[in-house]
Amino acid sequence: MSTLTKLALGAMGQLRPRPAKGDARAVIKLPAPDTRGALPLMQVLARRRSTREFARKPLPLPVLSSLLWAAFGMNRRDGGRTAPSAINAQEIDVYVAFPDGAYLYDARTHALQLVASSDLRRITGYQDFVDDAPLDLVYVVNHSRMKLIPVASRESYAAAAAGAIAQNVYLYAASAGLVT
């Protein structure tokens, strides 16, 4: 489906998810992430680039585990995360849209919790190349976690937090030889 078609259908409220491909599990337990790292930061930065072509095969579970941990996993016993957020609000939730369903990443248990048994990739945005990517990460702000942040600042703080998470994803992807 082209980007223009998606925009038109979205404006009319007619953009719909596709049926799930396969059976979604209620919980996907992720293996421990590989936190050793393989490349120096400057090499990772030199490799970072975006593409519109993705392999159609699923990401191996150990790679997905490390990707999600890098994005917004817990890296301290006190619940601290790999990406910063203002006053530690941790207001961003990371969802993973697969062909068989959509999941919420739970950093505390390092697991994915099923939230929808449909293929939501085509309705997570308007870029047509995401429709068939092996997965799509979606960052959603939960304003109820931002009560200590002035209302006028919440949108910009949440955008900064989501940007930090996205940057972690880009850096991990470049270090692991993945495309974004």
Give a label for each model feature.
Residues R48, L67, V94, L135-T180:
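Small-aliphatic-rich amphipathic alpha-helix that forms the alpha element of a beta-alpha
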